[in-house]
Amino acid sequence: MTVKIGINGFGRIGRLAFRRIMDLGEETKDIEVVAINDLTTPAMLAHLLKYDSTHGTFDHEVSATEDSLVVDGKKYRVYAEPQAQNIPWVKNDGVDFVLECTGFYTSKAKSQAHLDAGAKRVLISAPAGNDLKTIVYSVNQDTLTADDTIVSAGSCTTNSLAPMANALNKEFGIQVGTMTTIHAYTATQKVLDGPDRGNNFRNARAAAENIIPHSTGAAKAIGLVLPELNGKLDGHAQRVPVKDGSETELVTILDKKVTAEEVNAAMKKYESPSFAYNADQIVSTDVLGMTAGSIFDPTQTQVITAGDKQLVKTVAWYDNEYSFTCQMVRTLLHFATL
């Protein structure tokens, strides 16, 4: 039986999820997007789906009616309901599963509104706290069961970090580590200098003109994906003046002494559609549109030895929009059919 999907929030991730599901074709035969909820008009949603400043023009016929998005002749009903519990898509469209992409329903308690409205399952496209499973596909998707109803797909950085940390820990054991994500700016930042609602002085500065230190919970969230690493990793972000394309640098102290060659060989061992390996000397624009959650870069591996102590640095690239979306869709396909 086909699982019917409603996308709540048709912003950067919601639209890219729709694109990815369409582009996968027969691979998504077990699911069907039937409705969208977003607080703007179908005409605006159609325009933003078709034309994307980062990922290019969507290669499908896209138009809109008064109450629908139309892609390749198929209608997708559009709602503009601000309260999740009031979206009538279960009754009207048979929605079974909500892909929650608004950035607002980012907890078990908040996303419960979708279940109260009749949906059976919810996948949140953001970190969502300690009381929900956080799933990074290729690392811990096997922890999902048919009894799970609300699950988090984590963040783009967690999806970049987890495969690399998992490989290091399984092969060599991680004692402690710190992560830095060199991260593209996002829609929550300022185009020009201006007051920040949270009174964060750095967030008040122009995103495309500055390197801006920023917090991230991605490293701490690794404990939700890999419990054996809980409390062992922390980190921060540097938001940089690029619109997309990021990298994660992880510096660790390991249980075993290693060489750079041994570390790279270990990463190669864990290569998968979710965790790629590329020895070319790439830069950030080269990873735009990549479908892996991250690409390990062996050219940047460093092992620094001082006596009997070592620091090990490993690096993975990721498209902070599309890599995460592809990972989320992998989780969606797995979760929806349990």
UniProtKB/Swiss-Prot annotation:
Its EC number is 1.2.1.12. GO terms for molecular function: glyceraldehyde-3-phosphate dehydrogenase (NAD+) (phosphorylating) activity; NAD binding; NADP binding. Pathway: Carbohydrate degradation; glycolysis; pyruvate from D-glyceraldehyde 3-phosphate: step 1/5. It comes from the Bacteria. It is an enzyme of class 1 (oxidoreductase). It catalyses: D-glyceraldehyde 3-phosphate + phosphate + NAD(+) = (2R)-3-phospho-glyceroyl phosphate + NADH + H(+). SUPFAM superfamilies: Glyceraldehyde-3-phosphate dehydrogenase-like, C-terminal domain, NAD(P)-binding Rossmann-fold domains. InterPro entries: GlycerAld/Erythrose_P_DH, GlycerAld_3-P_DH_cat, GlycerAld_3-P_DH_NAD(P)-bd, Glyceraldehyde-3-P_DH_1, NAD(P)-bd_dom_sf. NAD(+) binds at R12, I13, D38, S125, N320. GO terms for biological process: glucose metabolic process; glycolytic process. Pfam families: Gp_dh_C, Gp_dh_N. Homotetramer. Belongs to the glyceraldehyde-3-phosphate dehydrogenase family. This is Glyceraldehyde-3-phosphate dehydrogenase. It comes from Lactobacillus delbrueckii subsp. bulgaricus. The gene is gap.
